[in-house]
Amino acid sequence: MEDLLRQNIQRTIGQQITDAQFEQFSSFLFLKSFDKKTILCEEGEHCKYVYFLLKGSAFSYLVNEYGDKHALQFALEGYWITDHYSFFSGKPGIYTIETLEAGQMLVLNRENFERICDSNHLFERFFRILIQNAFIGLQYRLAKTNSEDAEHRYAEFSNLYPAFIQRIPQYLIASYLGIKPQSLSRIRKEQAGKK
């Protein structure tokens, strides 16, 4: 736990933190275990926590009028996940977050989020950078979804996130990329044939 979280903080802020700073940061989080298919936040309900994955995987999604899940974000070990809209506004969530595998997470509530940011400027900087990176990633994904074909989107996704390809169900990856599962299957076969 300690190494994964500490590495995440240091990589994000681009500098080392002291043991005292790490202990201070860690004191605001609590450890929780989750089963597979646990709903962490549900659309329409207030999302009260930010989650840091130590073990396992999770994803966020919207459900359309036909009951189809549209994946928005994936998280494996070393990733943070939340419904930013609900967590920061206090309003009902706009999507659902569910575990894909059983695992453990460090959990941070809104009150402790404010305390952690107020306690040290490095921690406020850390979360600012995380939120900026989430926003940048979302803008980039929207631009690519609207300007590139499915083959390019999958190739880039598989190059950037090879661990996701191994652990996330293909139908969810297809949903994330905005394509049908059958199309993803065809693309994967074509790309495998080129290797």
What are these regions (language model features)?
Residues 1-30, 86:
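Cyclic nucleotide-binding regulatory module and flanking cytosolic helices
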Residues 14-17, 104, 144-147:
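Localized chelating/binding microdomains
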Residues 32, 51, 73, 98, ...:
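Residues that recognize and position ribonucleotide moieties
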Residues 39-99:
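Cyclic nucleotide-binding regulatory domains
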Residues 61, 83-84, 115-116, 157, ...:
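Residues that scaffold the ATP/ADP-binding catalytic core of kinase and kinase-like folds
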Residues 93, 112-149, 153:
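A small-molecule sensor/coupling module
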Residues 148-195:
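Phosphate-/nucleic-acid-contacting segments
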